[in-house]
Design a protein with these regions (language model features):
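A conserved ligand/cofactor-binding region detector
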Residues: 1-802
Length: 802
């Protein structure tokens, strides 16, 4: 009889577990608290991953392999213990090890806070890519800031969002490995001095203020591979306390220097509705870029001893415009520290950087005031000015002296530095994140740049770490898939396509419905434990969970709910398929209208809750403090996936992919990745409404007047008037006025189509086998949205890894 092969990692864990408990806490496994078990298990996993990473990167260096450095202002990592144990294929072994001590591994996971390093889709995408890069075996390091308080903890007080510090480090620091020997000095403010020496023009930066960047490493395991990615996070500190200044009585000045430095790594996206907030955000961005580029250069020099081959051995990827200052920072190092001439330095830079754009909206493309940049980072400002001068000169030559086109393409104009334009000018690749988005970039956002250098522009549709969102989050569905199509899909998402063969198998469809029901029951139990809210699991779970922004049109959803509510108020006994609308979203602290929309959702939920007869049929729930962990519970339980942004405004989305993977039916516009979801699942398995991007542009060109829709549609008028009159005792005049008078995202124009789509999706749900078949086809088509596929496309087409 064959014996089961011993897992060497498991043998090590069994040995280390009681030893570390005794060493750190002086307790045995029988005596240990769940929190102590969490810390010890986490520390063991970190050591295992650290050793794997060292071996992985040593091999990369030995073969002269190219490394990927992924710069992003945010990485929405979620919890690490469960994912790491799963990816290392240790879950069963650890559960077995803990069983004699009556320790429940699922309860241990609950002691880990979500790492407070991100906010929305941008950060979650970055986290998924670190997972995908490790799984596919590409050597990668992410760079970001170690935010002490993350984005914020959202708390609703009488429906109003309040922001509390997200104090994640006490529980999360076990995953951070300090690397103080790699600290880097970052220079702010100061003066520039120019001089010539041996016919070389030197610029010296003097009288600057120094901030010390100290790195902490977080390891990200791949699934079933030798790969381990690293997320290097920088903390900011003043170099030392100025005791002399303090002793002279200059207390405020001595403390202020420390305070400014320490503020840099306190909070993600500080409110920038005032000058101080803008200054802090700029400091954060330069701090991230200077520390990361300095570290990349130091690592490269330690291995190769030259920067001549930097672009051959290093790919630096800019995830949205926040890390754009990495471009002039690398120029600064090459010019000032290494003595390169401009042309050679620029050649290295433009072969090293690639840029992913994440927005098509002009107002969201980052711009910085010239005077602010000149004051805070004077040397970087002077380099940007020179880049712009040379870039504009080359454009004039290329475009036959077309000064108007050159002005449109200029990096500096209207006293502002356009960061996206700088990225396009300096990167060898510019990509969008869905087919539609990439076309919009070429045809409108960067049309002049596309005409100038069409070979730069590419598309890589977003992908998700599907093992986290399916295998870890939805074990019931995973088991059903394994029973029907085998286990190859665990390593290769494309294998999910084989599930489509069962779309007419009533036994499989029944099992699929059973899995969904179990997931809804489990989610309802989770919500009740967390918030006391009771969900009707026999109702449709209609889900819109994403950052709160007008372009995502949560208020379109609200208008339909108000219309349903008015219908039931008029006739409580009217036929109505029970539906629960589930919202979760954070609004930026300074975004007042978004906060009003949250308050309005909460007010509707409260008013309906107070009406027992109606609340049996219609209910609205707003879940506080949306995060990765909440999402992992919600995605498997969702029936309807609301992806209702105005066509042409959402770059791609990733929540739509996670919901599709878990069998939810998309109710959406032809925007972002919804178009590709439609292609993947089939036209009959998605519900599309609203204008297309060309129709939106045509209506805007004709002159969109929302008041006409208000005057001509009774349901629209009734919903908006209800906002004016009040919901649960609170009026929402600002939201109503924004819709009736401006409506920048054409909510009213799409409302009738949206309402009909809602009615149709409800009809589909009532036919249980039809709905299950639609759900199955979504699951089967979701493999294309794997992060493994996405990072492989980046590696082959953009980073040129072999």
């Amino acid at each position: 009889m064959a014996t089961k092969k011993a897992n060497p990692l498991m043998d090590r864990i069994k040995e280390e577990f009681p030893r570390k408990l005794q060493l750190l806490y002086s307790v045995s496994p029988e005596e240990a608290s769940d929190k102590q078990v969490y810390h010890v298990l986490s520390s063991i996993i970190v050591e295992i991953l650290g050793a794997k990473r060292q071996s992985f990167i040593n091999h990369t260096h030995s073969v002269g392999g190219k490394q990927i450095y992924y710069l992003s202002m945010e990485f929405l990592m979620g919890r690490s213990l469960k994912t790491s144990i799963y990816n290392l294929e240790l879950a069963d072994g650890i559960k077995e090890m803990l069983k004699p001590y009556d320790i429940n591994l699922e309860k241990i996971y609950e002691h880990e806070p979500d790492a407070g390093l991100g906010n929305g889709g941008l950060g979650r995408l970055a986290a998924c890519y670190l997972d995908g890069l490790a799984t596919t075996g590409f050597p990668a390091m992410g760079y970001s800031i170690c935010y002490e308080y993350g984005i914020f903890q959202q708390k609703l007080e009488d429906g109003w969002q309040t922001e509390l510090p997200d104090n994640w480090l006490p529980g999360g620091s076990v995953w951070l490995v300090p690397k103080p020997e790699l600290s880097i000095d970052i220079h702010f403010e100061g003066d520039l001095q120019e001089y010539w020496d041996d016919r070389y023009h030197y610029i010296s930066h003097v009288n600057y203020n120094t901030v010390v960047a100290t790195p902490y490493d977080m390891y990200v395991s791949g699934y079933g591979s030798d790969g381990v990615s690293v997320l290097r996070l920088w903390t900011a500190k003043a170099p030392s306390f100025d005791m002399e200044m303090f002793n002279k009585g200059n207390y405020d000045r001595a403390l202020a220097q420390n305070s400014i430095a320490n503020a840099i790594s306190k909070v993600l996206y500080p409110n920038d509705n005032h000058h101080e907030g803008k200054s802090l955000r700029l400091r954060q961005q330069y701090f991230l870029c200077a520390a990361s580029v300095g570290d990349i250069v130091n690592t490269h020099m330690n291995v190769y001893g030259t920067l001549e081959n930097l672009a051959d051995k290093v790919a630096i990827h800019i995830n949205d415009t926040h890390p754009t200052l990495a471009i002039p920072e690398l120029m600064r190092i090459l010019l000032d520290d290494c003595g390169y001439g401009w042309d050679k330095a620029w050649d290295i830079v433009t072969r090293t950087f690639a840029y992913t754009n994440h927005t098509v909206m002009a107002e969201a493309l980052e711009k910085w005031d010239v005077n602010l940049v000149k004051t805070v980072i004077p040397r970087i400002f002077s380099i940007i000015v020179e880049i712009n001068n040379r870039y504009c000169q080359s454009l004039m030559e290329r475009n036959g002296g077309d000064s108007a086109k050159t002005t449109r393409m200029s990096i500096i104009k209207d006293n502002q530095i356009h960061m996206a334009t700088l990225c396009v000018a300096a990167s060898h690749s510019v990509n969008g994140v869905s087919k539609l988005h990439s076309e919009i970039i070429k045809q409108s956002v960067f049309h002049d740049e596309y005409e100038n250098t069409p070979e730069k522009f590419k598309n890589v549709t977003n992908g998700i770490a599907y093992r986290r969102w399916l295998l870890q989050s939805n074990p019931g569905l995973t088991q059903l898939l394994s029973d029907t199509i085998g286990k190859k899909f665990i390593k290769d998402g494309a294998e999910l396509e084989n599930f489509r063969e069962y779309q007419d198998d009533k036994e499989v469809l029944t099992k699929l419905m059973d899995v969904k029901k179990e997931n809804k029951e489990a989610f309802a139990k989770y919500v009740k434990n967390q918030s006391g809210i009771i969900l009707n699991t026999d109702s449709i779970f209609d889900v819109q969970v994403k950052r709160l922004h007008e372009y995502k049109r949560q208020h379109l959803n609200v208008m339909n709910i108000l219309s349903d509510y008015a219908y039931l108020l008029n006739d409580p006994d009217a036929p109505f398929t029970p539906k629960t609308y589930i919202f979760a979203a954070k609004a930026a602290p300074g975004y007042y209208l978004a906060k009003q929309i949250i308050k309005m959702i909460w007010a509707i939920s409260e008013e309906i809750r107070k009406n027992p007869k109606i609340s049996q049929k219609l209910s609205v729930v707003f879940l506080e403090n949306y995060c990765v962990t909440l999402s992992e519970h919600l995605m498997p339980a969702s029936d309807v996936s609301e992806q209702i942004s105005l066509a042409g405004t959402e770059a791609s989305g990733t929540g739509n992919m996670k919901l599709m993977l878990n069998g939810a039916i998309t109710l959406g516009t032809l925007d972002g990745a919804n178009i590709e979801i439609k292609e993947a699942c089939g036209d009959d398995n998605i519900v599309i409404f609203g204008m297309t991007t060309p129709e939106v542009n045509e209506l805007r060109a004709r002159g969109y007047n929302p008041c006409e829709y208000y005057n001509n549609d009774n349901r629209i008028r009734e919903a908006i008037d209800r906002m004016y009159r009040g919901i649960n005792g609170c009026t929402f005049n600002d939201v109503a006025n924004s819709l009736k008078d401006r409506d920048p995202y054409m909510v009213l124009a799409d409302f009738d189509s949206y309402r009909k789509a809602q009615q149709y999706i409800t009809e589909c749900y009532e036919d249980k086998f039809k709905w299950a078949k639609m759900s199955l086809n979504n699951i089967a088509g979701a493999g294309i949205f794997s992060a493994d596929r996405a990072v492989t496309e980046y590696a082959e087409n953009i980073w040129h890894l072999r």
